[in-house]
Amino acid sequence: MSRKRKREPEPAMLTLAGIYEKLADESEDQRLRAAHSLLKDFEPRSTSIDQIKVIITRLFRGLCSSRKAARLGYSVALTEYLIELNVQRGASIENGIPASSIIDILDNETTPEGNNSGQDERDHYFGRLFGAEAIIKSNTLVKQQDLLQWKRLLDLICGIANKKPWLKQECGWILYECIKSFAANEPSVPDDFALAVVEKLTAHKLIRTPEGLAIWLEVSKAFPHAKLPKDVWKHRDPLSKKDITLLADVLKDAKSRTNSDEEEHKSQGKAVWSVQLHFAWDVVLARLYSNELVNGKHIQKDHKVITLSVFWEKAVEGKISHKCLFYSS
């Protein structure tokens, strides 16, 4: 009786296996070479849609590795591959892969299984965040003008921020940088994409957080015609004089005031304490400074908005004094 010969792996599979291995290499140079090889040997225009889906699935899965080097390598490769997919296949669903399929793969490959360890769950949430960032950087959803899938991706990011508070600042930073990127590419980016970020943060009760504050300020500056929600900040401006106490509380990552109509917007959990100053402080201080500086002179343009000195007195010195009294009592 003759034995069946083992089926030899196809050359393409062997090539991909080598690329995946090098994407996880500790050497940044090796990782970049591997990403370049992936784009060269399996460029989207000459690769079947089925093969492209297999590659994208493997890249998303690689983001869930416990090795930092692997997450970095797979993240770069995924971002660049999605960019090339847009360029070579175009934004049309007929030629490329619909945004819904890409979000499906992200969701499926980065969902931790029920019986997994805490470390494995942590790795999967990191993978989900890195994957979401890769999709954002590739501009796939904007190019396909798929607002529905954009909102779906925002739900995934907000879900990470609420479920894992120690990732909340990273989630906010990715969305803040996304709004800045939108602003740089305006008017090709519709206001609806920027507005959706604010709306989803509001829906997930993350708008009155340092991250939500920074994003709101950036959206209001970059997309002045976007109709922001009315019931979050007075006059739709976090720097309104009437909101100075709330502004100070948010910047300290404290719970916001709990009047009946404000309870819905209170901060959801505190982020892990860090000696590093939150990026929202830079955003607020820069906005206050630019409000006062006109033609090289300090001029307050809007009397309804707080000045830098008032902010410093109420939000910084006031909080410090309050803490000193608390600890000395």
Where are these regions (language model features)?
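Extended alpha-solenoid scaffolds built from HEAT/ARM-like alpha-helical repeats
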Residues: 2-329
